[in-house]
Every structure is written in structure tokens, then in C-alpha cells.
Amino acid sequence: MKKSKLSIILLILLSSPLYGKENNQDKSQEKETSNDVITVKATSIKNKETFSSLLLNNREEIKGKQLEQIKTNTIGNTVSKVAGVQAEGFGPNAARPVIRSLSGNRVGILVNNLPINDVSFISGNMPIPVDMNRINEISISKSSEALLYGGSSSGGAIHLWDDRIMTQFPEKAISGAVTFNGSTNNGNGGSVNIKFSNKENWIFNLSGATKRVSKYKIPTRSKVGACYSYQQLKDHFALRDQCQVDMKVFTSRNPEAYPYISEFWKKYQVEYELSEDDKYTFKDKDYFSGIGYVDNEPNLRYKPGSPTSIEHVTPPKHYVENNNNEIPNSFLKSQSGNASLSYIGDDGYLGFSVTDFQTSYGVPGYAYLTTKTTRERYKPVSVSNSNRRIDIQGKHDHLAPFLRDSAFYYSYSESKDEELVGQIASSVFNTKSHQLALETAHTPLFNRLNGAFGINGNYRDLKTSGYDAYLPSVLTKEYGIYWVESLNLSPFELTAGYRKGYTQHNLNIPANYNRGRGQGSNLQNRHFDTSANTLALSFTPIDEWTLKLQQNISYRAPEINELYTHGPHYAYLIEEQGNSEFNTEKSKSIELSSVIEIGNFSNKLNLYKTDYSGFKFRRLTGISRGAGPVMEWDDTDLETKGLEYE
């Protein structure tokens, strides 16, 4: 009865195959490990992973005690301890991950198998709408995942897992937990979670969390030492600008160097608006029309040999005052809540959840300048995000004799991101997005060939506003279809996959819209055909050692910030100009990896090389305007390579 009920529910929701993972019997055969960080084997079937990702076998996991030990407020800082992974530096409250020197548009961030379709890739100071308190597992792929998710994951991906939709029964009919935490330098917070289950089919889950930080303390001052050096500030005008220090340095005539006081200055000082520097002269006479030469008055302050000018320096004053031993404007406020309902049967599950996430925080460092929001030149900057998301997920095992399992993932979210200068919104991003992913895995063919077929699509409607908006409103649609197969020829395994995709950007520009200047003023709708393919050969002579050679090729469509930015981008203190003439970016990578796991001992070695054609990057133009240096998006060929050892 349970099986037929769930089949009916799923067939109503789906008219095509769905995507999923191994069945419960296979999961029980999964090899146990005490390591908190492991490399996922193709034979280790996780309830959360898609089957195609297990076939690619590229991910490392962080979970359990290790995750609790390294977890911070941001995703980037949490995963930065992994070899080859760093974090962008926008303070303790905003840090996107950087994988092998790549970030932003090339590194995907996914929650429960769906990409986060937000605007944090546009600017590193923008928040990622995820409450790290609720994350219980992280998977990291340092290799390209463009085959599964498109070009936005061509440089790798970070997968976040939480229990917003329950897929397994809790041990008790009613269970929960309440936590409180606090520290002298990381704020205070707490969380609550409660689960209700009838022990047969249904689970209802409620959870919430909050976090507050007033400021972060540091051992020294918050700015670089040169910003407090009187001599360096006096000698370098650009340094005073970068440090946002008001320090006037100017010269005037030295009265003691001039023997005479000008009679012409005495008579015409007011009429000709003459300055104090015009008062003193080396001439003993001044000429007046109709009168002739007139003797100048001797300067009683005159001292022969004195320098002709005097340097004046005002005391340095920081535009935004900050106390020693603390990061200014480093506050954080966040809260989140989730409610979900799951139906679990013998052959799979179906779940629905609603999540609300709110956060606001200061951007430490320097305030924005020359913004249109206020006449006052410098104001502290803060960022806020409000995100509401609906998730629906389902999985069905053994949908047909020739199908292993199928599953689907869907989310709808509404998000509002604001960059605030003082209390006024400088840039506002309102986003509505739909995301859908379907995947079906077939049963093994000839007991050797495993594979999966998938479809995914993203719809993002971005509307921009604000005094300093540097992007137009854009509607983006992205679709992709992929197929991956793995042939087991023990001790060898051959894996291959191919993806075909399409991306479209449609502008929504009012008639009186300010298109900016430079190359960013040429705004036009664009569409791109994309693709990706993967070929990998694994050699596992013994269970504890795997050697793998892998090649990935992908074509990434340019993102909206690369195409359409056209004005001051205050997060980077630059003027940014996009280029809507861009074509796709090609990346071709090859990687050799070795993984040895014996008990609690793990040894990992990765050697990689990636060649880019049409790599998109910001280039300095040599021009400076009110917002700072002008940078234009450009493309070039690029090679990256490296060696990682853990």
C-alpha cells in the first residue's frame, strides 16, 4: 500500500523520469569510515547525492566533528582549510569560496542538489542566503562539474546539505534540540529544532536559528600600518586616498624670503582677489598705469637666504573613525526559520519545505566615496538580504524494471539584496527564481555499465534599482541536458559524459535608463549555446588505493556582470564596465589524482592543468574617475596549473 501511494503522488507531480540514488539495500552495504573528510567512492551510495555525481567520483566531504570545529559564519571561511580552497576577503561576514584561484561565476554553490541562484557572484560583499548553523554536511568538488550543472560550476562546486526536507525517520516520534552559544569575540546565537513523526510515513520538522555579533576584536589596528604613518601619508597622495585619510599638504610663500611688500597688492588685493602669496615680492618697485613706478615697502621680516616656500601639513584625520583592537562596522544580525513535511515510503520519499532567511551586516574597512546617496562623502556601508524559498523534492526507487531510481528537485525563491550607504539604499537587487532538476539512473547493463540521464533548468528574474545601480534588470533562462555512463572493468573503471545547454539573457531597460559610458554602454540581449564533456579512467588495484586520470572540457556562457555592468562598483572602489559582445569561455582541464585510505590514514595527491580560451576578467584601463580606477571586462587566453597534497 505504501508503495502504490507514493507512486501515485510522484506520477501526479512528474510526467518525465526523475532523478535519484541507490536503494536502501545498497546503502546498507556502504563501507563505514571514521574519517570526517573522505573521497566519495562510486560504490558508496549517499541518500543525498545524485547517482551521476557518484559516477563522476570527484567530491570530498566535511561532516561530523570536523565540520563543527571549522564552521564559521561564511561558506568560504568554513572550507578554506581544504587544500586548493581559499576564501574571498570581504570581512568576517561575507566570503565566497575560491577553488584553485577561481571564484564567482565559475564556482557553483548548491544546497541539496540545487544551485543558489542569487547575486553574490556579482560582488563578493553580497551575502549567500544560507544559514551555516543549519548545515550538517559539505561536499567539495575541485574538479569541473559543468557536466551536471553548466558553466557556473566549470571551476568546481561547493555542495551544502541540511535537513530542510527529512528523508529518514528520526529515532523517536517526538525529538528535538535547543542550543545556545556565545563567545567574547564571535557573538551570541542559538537554534531550536523539533521533529514529529508517526513512525509510519509522515515527518513534520520545525527549526530556527539566530546569530548576533556587535563587533569583532583584533590584536592590532584595522588598517595597514602605512595608514597611520605621518611621513608616508604626507609623501603619498594616493595613499591618503586609499586609506581614506583627510590630510592636507600644501605650500605657501615664505615671507622671510622676500625683501619687499608689493604696493600693487595693497591697492588691488580686494578688486583682483589677490592671495596672501601675492603680497611679497623680490621687486623694489611696482608699475601703475598713468603713474609709473612706485617704490615697494621694505619687508621687515626679510631674512636673506631663507627658502622661498613653506610646507604646511594638517594633522591626519580618518574619515571614518575606528578604535584600536576592533574591526569597525563588523556587526552581524541573522535569523532563519524552516518548516517541512515529508512522506517516506518503502520505495522513496516526497518532501515539501518553506524557508525564511534574513541577514544584515556591516562591510568592514573603508566606506564608499562619491556615491549619489548623500552629499556627505563617506558613510559606513552595510548589506542586507531577505530570502524566502520553497523546496519540493522526491525520489522513487525501481520506477520500472530497467530503471534504478529517479528523483526530482524543485525550488522557488524570492530574494531582496541591498547595499546601504549610511541608511540609504545604494543598490537594490530583487530576484525571483525557479530551479528544476530531474535525473533517472538505469539498472546495470551486463553487470558492468551504470549510467544516468538528467535535465535541469534555471529561471532568474533580476530587477535592479537604487541611486548607484550598476546593472540593468535582466531575465535569465538556462537549460541543460546531460548523460553520464561508467563502465566497470575491474580494476579499471571508464567514465564518460556529455552535456548540451542553452543560456539566454533578456534586458528590461526603461526608455530613460542611464546606460553609462565606455564599452558598458552598448547593452543588448544575448543567447549562447553551451556544452561540456568528461572522460575519466580510474585504476583501483586494491580497495585502499585509487589512481585516476580525468579530462573536462566546457563552454561557459558569460554572466550578466561580465556583459552589462556599467558604472561605479563601490564594493571594489572601481568603475566597472561590462562587454555585451562577449562569446562563450572555453576551459580544458586534465587532472591526475591519487587517493590512499587505510583506516584513519588518508593520503591525497592532485596534479592539474587548465587552459582557458576567452577567459573573462577585469582589466585596468589606466583611467580614473570619481569612483576610482576604471576597469573593463576583457577576455584572454589563460593557463592555470598546480599540485595539491593532503
Q: Would you name each region that the model predicts?
A:
Residues 186-212, 222-360, 386-388, 395-397, ...:
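Transmembrane beta-barrel wall of Gram-negative outer-membrane proteins
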